Curated annotation (Swiss-Prot):
Residues 163-268 form the AB hydrolase-1 domain. The active site is at H167, S242, D387, H415. Coiled coil: none annotated. It comes from Arabidopsis thaliana (Mouse-ear cress). Residues 1-52 form the signal peptide. This is Probable lysophospholipase BODYGUARD 5. It is a lipid-anchor. It is an enzyme of class 3 (hydrolase). It is found in: Cell membrane; Secreted, Cell wall.
C-alpha cells in the first residue's frame, strides 16, 4: 500500500512542472520543424505540403469539411497562438525570391530540373521501397478472405454468414489472420462462414494516398467499395478492435438493415452530449504527461504534427534498416507481424486517422449507436480491466448511455491481450454471438 502511494506521488511529481517544461520545448520544436519541413518540401518536391498549423478557414480544400476533427487545428501551441507562424507561412515566398530553393534543386537534382513535375505516390519523407508503394496498382483495400472451398459451397445448401474484421491503429489484417482466424470454423453444422479481414485505408498493404484526409467517411466508403459491393454482401456481421470500432460502428450504421451483429473490443468511446467530443477524446487518449513512457510517446505523436513527421522520417522511411537491426539484436530470422505492421503507414495516414477517426469520429458515434439499436442490431462490447490505452470508463459510459449494449470486462487483460491471451475463447464467443443474431427485432 505504501509502495503504491509512493509510486503515485512520484508519477504526480514527474507529470507536474517538468511535464509543462518539456511540452513547452516541444511547442518550440514543432514550430521550428514546421519551418524546416516547409523549406525541405520546396526543395525536394517544388511545393510546400500543407499542414494544420493554419486556421481551417484560411486553408482547407477538403469537400467534406464536417468530417475533419477540430483537434487538427485546435491543438494548443504557445508559439502558434502568439502569431509566430506568420514567418513560416511566408518562408516559401522568401526562399524563392532569394533563389535558395532553385540553387539547392540544381545542386541535388541536376538531371530533373528540366523535367515536368508530377505527383508521386509518396512524400520524400515516406519510404519509397517496392513494398511500401505496391498499392499504386490498385484503388481498393487489401482484403484477406477465409472461406470454405468452392466445391464445399456448391455441395452444401447451408446459408453463408459474412463477417468483416476491422483492425485498430498501427495494425493490419494480420492482427486477425495470424490469431483469431486459426480458431474460427469455416463451416459449422448449420452455417458456412466467409471471413473478410481488411487493411484499412493508409495501413498495411492498402492504398496510402497522400491527398486523402483519412476521414471516417473515407474509411467507410473504401470498405464498401472493396468488400461489400464486390462480394454483393446483403447481410454481414462486424468485428472490430480499438480505432477500428469507430469505423466498424459507422459502417454498420450505414448498412443497418444488413448488419446482424457488431462485436467491439476496447472501443475508444467518448460521449458527445455537450459537443466538443473530439477535443475531449484527444485530452483523454493523449494527455500531456511524461509518465508512463507509452503515454508520453502517444502525447508527443498526437499533439505535434511536425515532430510526428520527423519520427516517421526516422523510423518508417528507414524501416528496413531498423528491421535488420532488430533481427541482429534479437537473433530472429523473421520478425513478428506486429512489429512489421507498426511502420506500414505514412505520417499522413497515421496522423489523420488518429485525429479524424479516433478524435473526430467521437462526434458521430452516439448517432451511429442509436441507429444500430433502433434497427435491432445486437452489440457486444468487451475490454480488459488492465487497459491503459483506452480508459475502462469508456465501457461504462457506453453502457450507461446505451443500456441495450452488452458489455463484458475481462479480468487481467489489457488493450491487446484481451484477444491475444484468449484467442480460442474469443473465437468461440464470436461464433456464439453470430449464432444468436439471426433475427433482428427493430426497437
Amino acid at each position: 500500500m505504501i509502495t503504491s502511494s509512493f509510486s503515485e506521488k512520484c508519477t504526480s511529481v514527474i507529470n507536474g512542472a517538468p511535464s509543462w517544461a518539456v511540452f513547452f520545448l516541444f511547442d518550440l520544436l514543432d514550430y521550428f520543424l514546421c519551418i524546416v519541413f516547409r523549406f525541405l518540401d520546396e526543395v525536394m518536391e517544388e511545393k510546400s505540403e500543407s499542414c494544420h498549423c493554419n486556421n481551417p478557414r484560411e486553408k482547407t480544400h477538403f469537400a467534406e469539411y464536417e468530417f475533419l476533427s477540430e483537434t487538427l487545428y485546435r491543438r494548443r501551441n504557445v508559439f502558434r497562438q502568439a502569431g509566430f507562424l506568420r514567418f513560416a507561412n511566408k518562408l516559401p515566398e522568401i526562399t524563392k525570391k532569394i533563389g535558395i530553393v532553385t540553387f539547392l534543386r540544381k545542386f541535388l537534382f541536376p538531371h530533373t530540373m528540366n523535367k515536368v513535375s508530377h505527383e508521386v505516390a509518396n512524400r520524400w519523407s515516406d519510404c519509397g521501397c517496392k513494398t511500401c508503394v505496391s498499392w499504386i496498382n490498385t484503388d481498393k483495400l487489401n482484403v484477406i478472405v477465409k472461406q470454405p472451398s468452392i466445391s464445399d459451397l456448391s455441395i452444401s445448401n447451408k446459408p453463408v454468414e459474412n463477417v468483416i474484421f476491422v483492425h485498430g491503429f498501427l495494425a493490419s489484417s494480420s492482427f486477425w489472420t495470424n490469431t483469431v482466424f486459426k480458431y474460427l470454423p469455416e463451416t459449422t453444422e448449420g452455417t458456412n462462414y466467409r471471413f473478410f479481414a481488411i487493411d484499412l485505408l493508409g495501413f498495411g498493404d492498402s492504398p496510402k494516398p497522400r491527398a486523402s484526409q483519412y476521414s471516417l467517411k473515407e474509411h467507410v466508403e473504401m470498405i464498401e467499395k472493396s468488400v461489400i459491393l464486390p462480394n454483393n454482401l446483403t447481410s454481414f456481421h462486424v468485428v472490430a478492435h480499438s480505432m477500428g470500432c469507430i469505423i466498424g460502428i459507422a459502417l454498420a450504421a450505414k448498412f443497418s438493415d444488413s448488419v446482424k451483429s457488431v462485436a467491439l473490443v476496447a472501443p475508444p468511446y467518448f460521449a458527445d452530449s455537450k459537443g466538443g467530443a473530439s477535443c475531449a477524446a484527444l485530452d483523454v487518449v493523449a494527455k500531456k504527461k511524461l509518465w508512463p513512457p507509452a503515454s508520453f510517446f502517444t502525447a508527443m505523436m498526437c499533439w505535434y504534427e511536425h515532430i510526428g513527421r520527423g519520427v516517421c522520417l526516422v523510423f518508417c522511411r528507414h524501416h528496413r534498416t531498423w528491421e535488420r537491426i532488430i533481427k541482429i539484436v534479437t537473433w530472429r530470422r523473421k520478425l513478428p507481424t506486429a512489429i512489421m505492421d507498426f511502420t506500414k503507414h505514412t505520417h499522413q495516414s497515421g496522423w489523420h486517422s488518429m485525429h479524424n477517426v479516433i478524435c473526430g469520429g467521437a462526434k458521430f458515434t452516439d448517432k451511429h449507436l442509436e441507429t444500430l439499436i433502433k434497427s435491432g442490431v445486437k452489440i457486444n462490447v468487451m475490454q480488459g480491466d488492465k487497459d491503459v490505452v483506452v480508459p475502462i470508463d469508456c465501457l461504462s459510459n457506453m453502457k450507461g448511455k446505451f443500456p441495450a449494449v452488452e458489455v463484458e470486462v475481462i479480468a487481467g487483460t489489457d488493450h491487446s491481450t484481451v484477444i491475444m491471451s484468449r484467442r480460442e475463447v474469443f473465437a468461440a464467443n464470436l461464433v456464439s454471438l453470430w449464432a444468436t443474431s439471426e433475427k433482428k427485432q427493430k426497437v
